[in-house]
Regions:
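Proline- and Ser/Thr-rich low-complexity, intrinsically disordered segments
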Residues: 1-173
C-alpha cells in the first residue's frame, strides 16, 4: 500500500488530484476495499477519509492507505472601514486596519489579486490609495481580499484680499 502522513489539509477546496501519497500509480477510493477508483476531478469533502492503492508490475495492492482530509477556508478579513481625512500640518499618516475573524494573520497587498506584498502599509500623501487585506490561516489564504481605501484631502487655501479704505476726516463744531 502507499504511505503518507494520514492527514492532509486542503485549502479552500480541492479535488482527488490534490491528495498526496507516496507510491507508484496511485488510485484513490471512497472505501477501504472494493469499489471503483475515484475520478481525479471529484471534489473533496471536508472530514472525509479517502483510501489509496498503488500499482506495481501491473498488480494493484490489496491494502489501502487511509488519508483523512480537512478543508480549511479562511474567512474574509473584516475591515475597520475606509479612512478619509482633511490634511493637517504636518500631514498625518494613515494606516489601514483589518482583522481576521478566525484568528489568522493579515497580509496587505496593492491589488485585489496578485500584486505586491506591502509589509507595513501607510499613506501620507494628498489623494487616495487602496490596500487589500488577505487573511492567512493554517497555511491557507482567504479566497478574496478586503479593500481598505485611505484618503487625505487637501486643506483649502484661504485667500484674503487686503482692501484699504481712504479715511475722510470730518470735523464737527
Amino acid at each position: 500500500a502507499p504511505s503518507g502522513s494520514g492527514n492532509q489539509l486542503v485549502c479552500n477546496s480541492g479535488t482527488i488530484s490534490n491528495l498526496v501519497a507516496t507510491g507508484t500509480s496511485i488510485l484513490w477510493y471512497a472505501n477501504t476495499t472494493g469499489g471503483s477508483p475515484l475520478n481525479p476531478t471529484t471534489a473533496l469533502v471536508n472530514g472525509t477519509t479517502y483510501y489509496a492503492s498503488q500499482t506495481l508490475s501491473s498488480c494493484e495492492s490489496r491494502n489501502r492507505y487511509q488519508l483523512a482530509v480537512t478543508i480549511t477556508n479562511p474567512a474574509l478579513p473584516t475591515s475597520a472601514g475606509n479612512q478619509s481625512v482633511c490634511q493637517t500640518n504636518p500631514i498625518q499618516t494613515l494606516i489601514p486596519v483589518a482583522t481576521s475573524p478566525d484568528g489568522g494573520t493579515i497580509t496587505w497587498y496593492n491589488a485585489p489579486t496578485g500584486g505586491s506584498l506591502i509589509a507595513a502599509p501607510t499613506w501620507n500623501t494628498i489623494g487616495s490609495t487602496t490596500f487589500y487585506a488577505q487573511n492567512n490561516n493554517n497555511s491557507c489564504t482567504s479566497t478574496a481580499r478586503t479593500p481598505v481605501t485611505l484618503e487625505i484631502k487637501a486643506a483649502p487655501l484661504l485667500t484674503i484680499t487686503n482692501t484699504t479704505c481712504a479715511a475722510n476726516l470730518l470735523t464737527y463744531s
